[in-house]
UniProtKB/Swiss-Prot annotation:
Job description of the protein: Produces ATP from ADP in the presence of a proton gradient across the membrane. The gamma chain is believed to be important in regulating ATPase activity and the flow of protons through the CF(0) complex.
Family: Belongs to the ATPase gamma chain family.
Membrane topology label: Peripheral membrane protein
Gene Ontology MF, one: ATP binding
Chief site of localization: membrane
GO cellular component: plasma membrane; proton-transporting ATP synthase complex
GO BP annotations listed: proton motive force-driven plasma membrane ATP synthesis
SUPFAM superfamilies: ATP synthase (F1-ATPase), gamma subunit (SSF52943)
UniProt subunit comment: F-type ATPases have 2 components, CF(1) - the catalytic core - and CF(0) - the membrane proton channel. CF(1) has five subunits: alpha(3), beta(3), gamma(1), delta(1), epsilon(1). CF(0) has three main subunits: a, b and c.
Name recorded for this polypeptide: ATP synthase gamma chain
Organism: Francisella tularensis subsp. tularensis (strain SCHU S4 / Schu 4)
Length: 298
């Protein structure tokens, strides 16, 4: 058993660490509230983009746009959104396990995989995989929002260009979904082809509504130009919304991780204090025994 001085040193060390984790918990809680506000602010825009896309797709259901229709799958693309920093529990690793399962299924089916990674954690993880080709990387930085948006837009454009050129036949996005402060779960959603976001019933209903003239759009300039721009904006809106939601997940996960660390530090301190008291009791007992032995000898 350690001596009393060593135990006191350990207690002080754990207390110092506890102060740091407690402060990080408060900072993460503050940042989480701001991230949730941003996430909620962008949701109406993303939902409106979804509605517009559904209506326009229904009105132009037979228009030969490469973003719309299925084709034989020989290669797929993934946009994986992670964090740039750690200390957020299992948030990133759970996401990577989820998307890696899908990637392995594709590889087993002899389907090639291209990945666009957003966040340094995803970049470091997928760089170690031999069968995965990283074609674009980007990072989101609150201190340089405009630069981050341009970088992310450029990375997304790489994937869109590859889809348009026929180099990939499906495009998916993997990110974390904010369920609550204490629960976040990985999510994989289809971005392209756009028809894949509709069920068979929705496609049938959209065709019927388009035939009956529910949506009758007049396009200025060329319909191809308008639809291409609209579809690109739609994909960008989906990605930006997912990035903001992932940021809220990151801060919530970090807050809970730091709270657990702070609570665990309290348990460790209690155990160390118990050990310290045992050591002191043993020392006192030994001293008393020595005094009694000396008195008996006299």
């Amino acid at each position: 058993m350690s001596n009393a001085r060593e135990i006191r040193s350990k207690v002080q060390s754990v207390k110092n660490t506890q102060k740091i984790t407690g402060a990080m918990e408060l900072v993460a809680a503050s940042k989480m509230r701001g991230a949730i506000v941003k996430m909620n602010n962008v949701r109406p825009y993303v939902e409106s983009a979804n509605t517009i896309i559904k209506n326009v797709t229904a009105a132009s259901i037979d228009y030969p746009n490469p973003y719309l229709f299925d084709r034989d799958v020989k290669r797929v693309g993934y946009i994986v959104i992670s964090t740039d920093r750690g200390l957020c529990g299992g948030l990133n690793i759970n996401l990577f396990k989820h998307v890696l399962k899908e990637i392995k299924n594709n590889i087993e089916d002899r389907v090639g995989v291209d990945v666009c990674v957003i966040g340094s954690k995803a970049e470091n993880f997928f760089a170690k995989l031999k069968d995965v080709n990283i074609v674009a990387t980007a990072h989101y930085n609150d201190k340089d929002k405009e630069g981050s948006i341009r970088a992310i837009g450029g990375a997304v454009k790489v994937m869109l260009d590859k889809f348009t050129a026929g180099e990939i036949d499906r495009l998916y996005m993997s990110s974390n979904q904010f369920v609550s402060t204490i629960k976040q779960r990985p999510r994989l959603q289809t971005l392209l082809p756009i028809q894949d976001i509709f069920s068979a019933e929705e496609i049938k209903a959209n065709k019927e509504k388009a035939t009956k003239g529910h949506w009758d759009y007049i396009y200025e300039r060329d319909i191809e130009e308008v639809l291409n721009a609209l579809f690109i904006r739609y994909i960008e809106a989906q990605v930006r919304g997912a990035i903001l939601e992932n940021a809220a997940c990151e801060q919530a996960a970090r807050m809970m991780a730091m709270k657990n660390a702070t609570d665990n530090a309290s348990d460790i301190i209690d155990q160390l204090k118990l050990d310290y008291n045992k050591v002191r009791q043993a020392m006192i007992t030994q001293e008393l025994a020595e005094i009694c032995s000396g008195a008996a000898a006299v």
